[in-house]
A protein has these predicted regions:
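Short Cys/His-centered divalent metal-binding micro-motifs
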Residues: 27, 52-74, 79
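Structural motif detector for alpha-helix initiation sites
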Residues: 3-5, 35, 49, 68
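Short Fe-S-cluster ligation motifs
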Residues: 46-62, 81-96
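Generic anion/oxyanion-binding catalytic loop in active/binding sites
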Residues: 7, 41, 60
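Histidine-centered nuclease catalytic patch
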Residues: 22-54, 63
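Short, charged surface segments at domain edges that flank catalytic/cofactor-binding sites
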Residues: 1-20
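Conserved short hydrophobic patches within well-ordered secondary structure
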Residues: 20-21, 75
Length: 96
């Protein structure tokens, strides 16, 4: 990797949520979170701090090699297939 713990801590600080679920995460519990490539390596992404986000373990394992947008689209399909309705499109905000 082309970054280290200090780089990651400087970017995300002491308190940070999962970039996908919004769950609060804790540096002191490494089982709570995983580093994720925003653009997966398999899709041409690089191993730099700018291509890094932190996800809760469950979200990262479910996301796998998908991009965030592909994963969100998959989640929408699952929700709809299970009989739930999305009452309005979920708009992406400026903050994420």
């Amino acid at each position: 990797m082309t970054f280290n713990y200090k780089d990651v801590h400087a970017k995300f600080g002491d308190h940070f949520p999962c970039a996908l679920t919004g769950r609060p995460l804790n540096w002191n519990n490494p089982e709570d979170y995983e580093y994720d490539h925003i653009i997966p390596i398999a899709r041409g992404g690089d191993n730099t701090i700018n291509n890094l986000q932190i996800l809760c373990t469950e979200a990262n394992q479910a996301k796998g090699h998908l991009t965030d947008e592909e994963f969100i689209d998959l989640c929408k399909e699952v929700i709809q297939n299970q009989g739930y309705k999305l009452y309005r499109p979920i708009e992406k905000t400026a903050n994420g």
